[in-house]
Amino acid sequence: MRASALALVLTAALLAGCGSSGSSGTTAKPNGEASKPASRVLADAEAAATNARSAHISGDITSGGTPITVDLTTARGKGGKGSMSTNGLKFDLVRIGDTVYVRGSDAFYKHFAGAAVAQLLHNRWLKGSATHGRLKSLAELTNLRSLFAHISADPGKIVNDGKTTYKGQQVVTLRSVGDDSKLYVAATGKPYPVAIVGNKNGQSGTVTFGDWNKPVSLSAPSDALDISQFGG
């Protein structure tokens, strides 16, 4: 559940606005999560998220002094799209099925491939396998199930601090005793994750979840260079 877990998976992937709660029905009825044990609320939030048809994930995190910005849209069983950056290294990402497309900034390409290659790849898309090879870890950023597996794995001691309001929405607060980060879960309708907020131990910032089950349009970039041609 920790914000650090999310920060670590985002950073690891790179280096290998707050949306609405989405469609949970027209009536916002209490869902009973406020009275459940923290572990049950976490499991319910993970189940709601991973069974959603789509979601939008966005925010800014600082992990160990490293700033990370993420803006991703995922579509279950289809793929996803968005962008991510850290320390000035930005890339755009599209995954459609088993194929992933990546377009890095000049700084991104220079960092990973050198100045000469960066010049050749200026504003160019690369494509490769989403299931193996160099781009697999980036492709996993568009898989909500994979992201939440990292967030919920070995959460340490967490407590249910009960119901509160976060940016106008009724939520249940799960708090990590170890690093004081918080996961806000919708207190009405389906128990979708609303936000993760980090507070200390080198982790700070907020990642929000929203636009649940909204339609997502994905299209493959044209003229993408196949990374397998470069031994990837």
Regions found by a protein language model. Give the residues of each.
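Primarily hydrophobic membrane-targeting regions of prokaryotic envelope proteins
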Residues: 3, 18-19, 55-58, 100, ...
